Protein backbone atom coordinates (compact mmCIF):
# COMPACT_ATOMS: atom_id res chain seq x y z
CA UNK A 1 0.00 0.00 0.00
CA UNK A 2 1.21 3.46 -0.89
CA UNK A 3 -0.10 6.24 1.38
CA UNK A 4 -0.56 9.66 -0.19
CA UNK A 5 -2.74 12.68 0.61
CA UNK A 6 -4.15 12.99 -2.93
CA UNK A 7 -4.91 10.90 -5.98
CA UNK A 8 -3.32 12.48 -9.07
CA UNK A 9 -4.13 11.63 -12.68
CA UNK A 10 -1.46 12.25 -15.30
CA UNK A 11 -1.36 11.50 -19.00
CA UNK A 12 -1.76 13.09 -22.40
CA UNK A 13 -4.71 15.10 -23.62
CA UNK A 14 -7.58 12.84 -24.57
CA UNK A 15 -6.64 10.08 -22.11
CA UNK A 16 -9.75 10.71 -20.01
CA UNK A 17 -8.26 12.47 -17.00
CA UNK A 18 -11.19 14.83 -16.49
CA UNK A 19 -14.00 12.40 -17.29
CA UNK A 20 -12.56 9.44 -15.38
CA UNK A 21 -11.33 11.77 -12.65
CA UNK A 22 -14.82 13.11 -11.94
CA UNK A 23 -16.16 9.56 -11.69
CA UNK A 24 -13.38 8.41 -9.37
CA UNK A 25 -13.75 11.48 -7.18
CA UNK A 26 -17.46 10.80 -6.81
CA UNK A 27 -16.88 7.10 -6.11
CA UNK A 28 -14.34 7.81 -3.36
CA UNK A 29 -15.87 11.04 -2.05
CA UNK A 30 -12.82 13.10 -2.95
CA UNK A 31 -12.85 16.72 -4.05
CA UNK A 32 -12.28 16.85 -7.81
CA UNK A 33 -9.78 19.51 -8.89
CA UNK A 34 -8.86 20.12 -12.53
CA UNK A 35 -5.55 22.00 -12.64
CA UNK A 36 -6.38 23.50 -16.04
CA UNK A 37 -9.57 24.96 -14.56
CA UNK A 38 -7.58 26.27 -11.57
CA UNK A 39 -5.28 28.04 -14.05
CA UNK A 40 -8.23 29.60 -15.88
CA UNK A 41 -9.82 30.71 -12.60
CA UNK A 42 -6.60 32.28 -11.29
CA UNK A 43 -5.64 33.96 -14.58
CA UNK A 44 -9.13 35.10 -15.48
CA UNK A 45 -8.48 33.94 -19.04
CA UNK A 46 -8.93 30.79 -21.11
CA UNK A 47 -5.98 28.53 -21.81
CA UNK A 48 -5.92 29.49 -25.52
CA UNK A 49 -5.88 33.17 -24.48
CA UNK A 50 -3.02 32.56 -22.04
CA UNK A 51 -1.06 30.79 -24.80
CA UNK A 52 -1.81 33.62 -27.23
CA UNK A 53 -0.67 36.39 -24.88
CA UNK A 54 2.05 34.67 -22.84
CA UNK A 55 3.15 31.72 -24.97
CA UNK A 56 3.71 28.22 -23.71
CA UNK A 57 6.33 29.44 -21.20
CA UNK A 58 3.80 31.83 -19.66
CA UNK A 59 1.21 29.10 -19.49
CA UNK A 60 3.68 26.72 -17.81
CA UNK A 61 4.38 29.40 -15.19
CA UNK A 62 0.65 29.63 -14.42
CA UNK A 63 0.52 25.83 -14.34
CA UNK A 64 3.38 25.60 -11.80
CA UNK A 65 1.67 28.08 -9.50
CA UNK A 66 -1.75 26.43 -9.79
CA UNK A 67 -0.38 22.93 -9.22
CA UNK A 68 1.55 24.03 -6.12
CA UNK A 69 -1.55 25.75 -4.75
CA UNK A 70 -3.81 22.77 -5.44
CA UNK A 71 -1.41 20.22 -3.98
CA UNK A 72 -1.26 22.06 -0.66
CA UNK A 73 -4.60 20.34 -0.03
CA UNK A 74 -5.45 16.74 0.70
CA UNK A 75 -8.33 14.38 0.06
CA UNK A 76 -8.49 15.47 -3.57
CA UNK A 77 -8.53 13.83 -6.94
CA UNK A 78 -6.33 16.09 -9.05
CA UNK A 79 -6.48 16.03 -12.84
CA UNK A 80 -3.30 17.56 -14.26
CA UNK A 81 -2.70 19.02 -17.68
CA UNK A 82 -0.80 16.78 -20.09
CA UNK A 83 2.34 18.93 -19.91
CA UNK A 84 2.50 19.35 -16.13
CA UNK A 85 5.17 16.64 -15.99
CA UNK A 86 7.59 18.69 -18.11
CA UNK A 87 8.72 20.77 -15.13
CA UNK A 88 11.07 18.94 -12.71
CA UNK A 89 9.59 20.85 -9.77
CA UNK A 90 6.09 19.76 -10.75
CA UNK A 91 7.23 16.15 -11.00
CA UNK A 92 8.76 16.29 -7.53
CA UNK A 93 5.61 17.85 -6.09
CA UNK A 94 3.34 15.32 -7.80
CA UNK A 95 5.44 12.43 -6.50
CA UNK A 96 5.49 13.87 -2.98
CA UNK A 97 1.82 14.85 -2.68
CA UNK A 98 -0.05 12.07 -4.43
CA UNK A 99 -0.61 8.53 -5.51
CA UNK A 100 -0.11 8.86 -9.25
CA UNK A 101 -2.23 7.17 -11.91
CA UNK A 102 -0.99 7.37 -15.50
CA UNK A 103 -3.87 7.17 -17.96
CA UNK A 104 -2.20 6.06 -21.16
CA UNK A 105 -3.82 6.44 -24.59
CA UNK A 106 -2.69 5.74 -28.14
CA UNK A 107 -2.28 8.53 -30.67
CA UNK A 108 -5.07 6.98 -32.78
CA UNK A 109 -7.49 7.12 -29.84
CA UNK A 110 -6.39 10.70 -29.08
CA UNK A 111 -7.08 11.76 -32.67
CA UNK A 112 -10.54 10.23 -32.47
CA UNK A 113 -11.37 11.71 -29.05
CA UNK A 114 -10.00 15.18 -29.87
CA UNK A 115 -11.25 15.42 -33.47
CA UNK A 116 -13.61 18.34 -32.83
CA UNK A 117 -11.76 19.92 -29.90
CA UNK A 118 -10.59 23.42 -30.86
CA UNK A 119 -9.47 24.44 -27.36
CA UNK A 120 -6.07 22.74 -27.40
CA UNK A 121 -3.40 25.30 -28.35
CA UNK A 122 -0.75 22.67 -29.06
CA UNK A 123 -3.06 21.04 -31.63
CA UNK A 124 -3.91 24.13 -33.65
CA UNK A 125 -1.79 22.89 -36.53
CA UNK A 126 -2.57 20.80 -39.61
CA UNK A 127 -0.16 18.01 -38.54
CA UNK A 128 -2.05 17.02 -35.38
CA UNK A 129 -1.02 13.38 -35.62
CA UNK A 130 2.69 14.24 -35.79
CA UNK A 131 2.31 16.69 -32.90
CA UNK A 132 0.71 13.96 -30.76
CA UNK A 133 3.46 11.46 -31.68
CA UNK A 134 6.14 14.02 -30.77
CA UNK A 135 4.45 14.86 -27.46
CA UNK A 136 4.12 11.17 -26.61
CA UNK A 137 7.77 10.47 -27.40
CA UNK A 138 8.89 13.25 -25.08
CA UNK A 139 6.34 12.89 -22.26
CA UNK A 140 5.69 9.14 -22.00
CA UNK A 141 8.98 8.43 -20.16
CA UNK A 142 8.11 11.19 -17.66
CA UNK A 143 4.62 9.78 -17.09
CA UNK A 144 6.05 6.30 -16.58
CA UNK A 145 8.66 7.58 -14.13
CA UNK A 146 5.97 9.14 -11.93
CA UNK A 147 3.26 6.50 -12.17
CA UNK A 148 2.32 4.32 -9.23
CA UNK A 149 -0.12 2.52 -11.53
CA UNK A 150 -0.91 2.76 -15.25
CA UNK A 151 -4.12 2.09 -17.13
CA UNK A 152 -4.41 2.00 -20.92
CA UNK A 153 -7.70 3.77 -21.60
CA UNK A 154 -8.02 2.88 -25.31
CA UNK A 155 -10.30 -0.14 -24.94
CA UNK A 156 -12.50 1.27 -22.18
CA UNK A 157 -15.43 3.57 -21.77
CA UNK A 158 -15.01 6.06 -18.94
CA UNK A 159 -17.27 3.88 -16.76
CA UNK A 160 -15.22 0.73 -17.44
CA UNK A 161 -11.91 2.51 -16.89
CA UNK A 162 -13.24 3.84 -13.60
CA UNK A 163 -14.32 0.36 -12.51
CA UNK A 164 -10.85 -1.04 -13.26
CA UNK A 165 -9.20 1.76 -11.32
CA UNK A 166 -11.51 1.33 -8.32
CA UNK A 167 -10.27 -2.24 -7.92
CA UNK A 168 -6.60 -1.31 -8.39
CA UNK A 169 -6.79 1.66 -6.04
CA UNK A 170 -8.55 -0.27 -3.30
CA UNK A 171 -5.53 -2.56 -3.03
CA UNK A 172 -2.70 -0.15 -3.77
CA UNK A 173 -3.54 3.28 -2.37
CA UNK A 174 -3.74 3.49 1.39
CA UNK A 175 -6.93 5.41 2.09
CA UNK A 176 -9.65 4.50 4.55
CA UNK A 177 -12.37 5.54 2.10
CA UNK A 178 -11.16 3.31 -0.73
CA UNK A 179 -12.86 0.12 0.38
CA UNK A 180 -14.99 -1.06 -2.57
From Swiss-Prot:
Pathway: Metabolic intermediate biosynthesis; chorismate biosynthesis; chorismate from D-erythrose 4-phosphate and phosphoenolpyruvate: step 5/7
Chain residues that bind ATP: 14-19, 120
Family matches, as Pfam families: SKI
Molecular function terms, GO-annotated: ATP binding; magnesium ion binding; shikimate kinase activity
Gene Ontology cellular-component annotations: cytosol
Cofactor note: Binds 1 Mg(2+) ion per subunit.
Annotated EC: 2.7.1.71
Function: Catalyzes the specific phosphorylation of the 3-hydroxyl group of shikimic acid using ATP as a cosubstrate.
Protein's recorded name: Shikimate kinase
Amino acid sequence: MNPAPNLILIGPMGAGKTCIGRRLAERFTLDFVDVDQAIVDAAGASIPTIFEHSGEAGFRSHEREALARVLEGRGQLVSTGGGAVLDPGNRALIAQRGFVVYLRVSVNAQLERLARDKGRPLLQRPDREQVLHDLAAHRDPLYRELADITLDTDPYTAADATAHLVVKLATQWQRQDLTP
